[in-house]
């Protein structure tokens, strides 16, 4: 199924998982003895000060041992949970959080945005001089919900359990596929609710990138398969329909359309925009209208339209994206993200990030026509997240293990079973999201994106939302917001603060009690 295999080449997946991989990246399965040594949860008491008030909480770091249904595959799934002290668990919301990849641990959202302790960054999201350190997080979601951060199998400290005395990576493959991954996450959530007496709590999901894909699917699957009712879902920089993010097939024109507004936003940020709009909102709105009308028609027409008409469309595309007209004509209006990121600031000797187009650095390989192997908006963050989380989990949470914490594991994506997608097409969860919303009219959904995200562009989600054909009673329950920033827009202070307010509003609308 070649189209399914192409999904593994999607920029957001390949770039994340290959960053800093090093020569030896095999994550072996853990033996039963190793699992037994780490599965016992460790509880610690903490407090942070937010707006002059103390927020005290209990942190638990541990693992849940689970088995896939109708399978002998077992795994130890690592988690860190936070429970605000002095609250009634039956009325207190609980949120299950995971990142994406597939192959990424939850540390990104954990110490990047939602947890009570956050990686110290500048207001623009840049990293200060090492060593990395954590600070109290005034935008922690613990202010309005308890939190459970989950590392899917093969990431973080989560491991498949090896059958023999020696660990191997074969056991992990039973969990590395679209459906098996969803089943294992659903089983973890069920077991966690059992073990911690949280069935009566308002329940939420929050997932980033492929984690948004997971959360959208689970919005339909958890109630249907597990009897787990949900109050809300937050999709952070999600990929909902892969067919809108992949432009490898010239018969599929939509990816060439959905990326254009983010290209225009990035060009505007760097002073390369040559259109008529004068602010970011107007720039993107004009780009949205143009890309799904004139540009789409020009791409669809092939050679049937007069060349002058097509030339005018391509000239306008060049103007709003900041690229040379010749470059746009060379690609016939079909601009891959890597080409855009390489060419936009080429005259300055710089490249922009795919994960955040507002970030630029000197081109590390100016003599190559291709995009650098390292993303300037992602790579610098990786060592800081890894080192800060390793210190945090051991020193503050007192969780002791000799297992390596895998922030990103390329073995997962390389072995991922994309063929589990329905009908052999590219994966998509738009219909599942529609079903989840329609069958649960009280479910609230927030889609959050960054304007400068060139991996999962916001306009792809906006395009999906407009075509879900939700009932007028249900449609107000779904909200899409776009923030200044990239894929991890929450690294910027202004975006993180607004995201916190938007998420808090969703919880107040959907849970049974107002949150303080």
PLM ranges: what are they?
Residues 26-94, 106-108, 112:
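Catalytic-loop region of hydrolases
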Residues 71-176, 466:
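N-terminal cap/lid subdomain of alpha/beta-hydrolase-fold enzymes
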Residues 116-120, 223-320:
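A catalytic-pocket lid/entrance helix-loop region that shapes and gates access to the active site
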Residues 183-201:
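Conserved acidic catalytic loop of the alpha/beta-hydrolase fold
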Residues 198-210:
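Alpha/beta-hydrolase fold nucleophile elbow
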Residues 301-455:
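Alpha/beta-hydrolase fold catalytic core
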Residues 443, 457-467:
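Short alpha-helix in the alpha/beta-hydrolase fold that links the catalytic acid
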Residues 484-495:
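Catalytic histidine-centered segment of alpha/beta-hydrolase-like enzymes
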